[in-house]
Amino acid sequence: MDIIHVQHPLSSIYTAEAEPCVLPLGFFDGVHLGHQELINLAKRIAKQQDLKLAVMTFFPHPKQIIGNDQTPQTYITPLEQKAKLMQDLGVDTLIVVNFDSAFAHLSPSGFIEDYLCGFKCKHAVAGFDFRYGHKGKGNLETLKIEGKRFFEVTEMKKFEIDHEKVSSTKLRNLIAEGRFAEIPAYLGSYFESQGTIDSIDNQHVIVTLSEAFLTPPPGEYLIEIQTEGYVHEGIAHQIMDGSFQRSWHLHFNDSFPCKGKKIHIKWKSESIKKSKQMKDRRAKSIAKVQAF
């Protein structure tokens, strides 16, 4: 998969090399089941029309620019992880538009002419609530009306599970509340974040979570780590001793074999029942930290 990073005004260097494509549009944080349905719909259209499948997304999150929010944004799937998921879905080209003030002031018709036509879009696919252009003035209806001279438009209706819309907002709320067991029903997999290993002492690992990912609330959770082809299940928790919020303590039944500093953590559920053995190990770990 090719990844193209562009910013406004769009350079002809990129558009000159563009191939006719089907183009799903959206921010796609999480690449949840609704996003996957939309991209797979676009993929089927691309196959039928013998076109490339490109996806257009944006970075950083629009609200950081539009809302003038200076706080660094955190994501369900930061850009690097989003790109990997797009590749797994069979996307040929990922177009990442730098969402800055100049781009935010682009008119809806300017977005269509500069970006969709610029990247030779022959068929656009977007969710029913997709907005674009300055102050979000563009919507699916304007996309169909203004774009009909250049491309077809397919609208994906609201994607629901148990009569509830699947959305990134829903997932962000579940993560904020630590309700990880409910997430696979909407995401298609467990929520996963990345951490940097600070120290390892047999079954006890201290990690600092990446600032790019959403952070679980303080608590104790069942987790899963995959290293060297093996799955290791354990417990993650924070010690409320004034330490930095992104520092977490992981405990495993066996010694933790890990090469390198980066690990990916799957957050599976809140830990309610814990074995006495795990409790004892946790108590010993806490004592070590406090003594240090």
Model regions: which residues?
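Core alpha/beta nucleotide-donor-binding catalytic domains of modification enzymes
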Residues: 37-97, 101-114
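Di-metal (Zn2+ and/or Mg2+/Mn2+) metal-binding site signature of metallo-dependent hydrolases
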Residues: 24-42
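Glycine-rich, Lys/Arg-enriched anion-binding loops that position phosphate/diphosphate groups
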Residues: 148-234
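Positively charged, low-complexity intrinsically disordered leader regions
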Residues: 1-21
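Phosphate/ribose-recognition catalytic cores of enzymes acting on nucleotide-derived substrates
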Residues: 199-292
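Conserved beta-strand elements of the Class I
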Residues: 21-23, 54
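Residue-level signal for inorganic ion chemistry
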Residues: 32, 86, 124, 183, ...
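Contiguous mid-protein beta-loop-alpha structural module that forms a pocket-lining wall or clamp
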Residues: 88-182
